[in-house]
Amino acid sequence: MTLLVRDGRPCLLEAHLARLSQSAKMLDLPAPDLDAWRAAVALGVRRWADDHDGEGVLRLVYSRGRESGGPPTGFATIGALPDRVAGARRDGLAAITLDRGLPLGASDMPWLAAGAKTLSYAVNMAALRHAERQGAGDVIFVSSDGHLLEGPRSTVVIATAGPEGDPLLLTPPPWYPILRGTTQQALFEVARNKGYDCDFRALTPTDLFTAQGVWLVSSITLAARVHTLDGQRLPDAPLAADIAGLVDTALTSGR
């Protein structure tokens, strides 16, 4: 799990702990001791805040433990934001679509661990390196049957016009073989309270090119607007400032 630390506090901690528990269940790990995790987070954040004024990246790692047997192992680390984050927040980024090699039905194949937060980042990192070679900063995965899934480290959110012409925020359904984003969930909750319509919908790459804005939403980069997709410039996003503000509000909603 990766959390943002801002103003000396972890953002959306309880949502991340809930996802830690769910991922542990999917991987047949013992249920994590959430109070112990809260104590570890509090200690790490306090020590970070003693020496740093800026934001930090907090990672929670939970494993089965030693190969020889014994109890599970858990630890937390905290460090500075990657250099790429400030630029992606400020300027947006270029992305490419890539076939993930999974059908939508992969969520019914538990041995693939689709939808679990794991340390198996080989495919995600390889995809990001491939994007970099193509001159892009991120990736949007597509299922083998042509539907949008997620980014290697983010959730896809688009803005479009609803039935009455009002803004409508959409994201792929959580029953797809994806990791449901904590930041996306918090964003939708805040957006609904502000009067926005939000929903899940089956989306295809074509929807990205006709949308009124495309964002890759995550705990650290927050809302990175996709301004170029597969080498094609996307239309301007009228809601760019609004979405950025909603995500900022969402970050503190679960404290």
Model regions and ranges:
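Ordered, amphipathic secondary-structure segments that act as subunit-interaction surfaces
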Residues: 51-61
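Helix-start/capping segments and mature chain N-termini
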Residues: 1-35, 39-43, 63, 67-255
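Phosphate/pyrophosphate-binding loops at sites that engage ATP/ADP/AMP, CoA/4′-phosphopantetheine
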Residues: 45-51
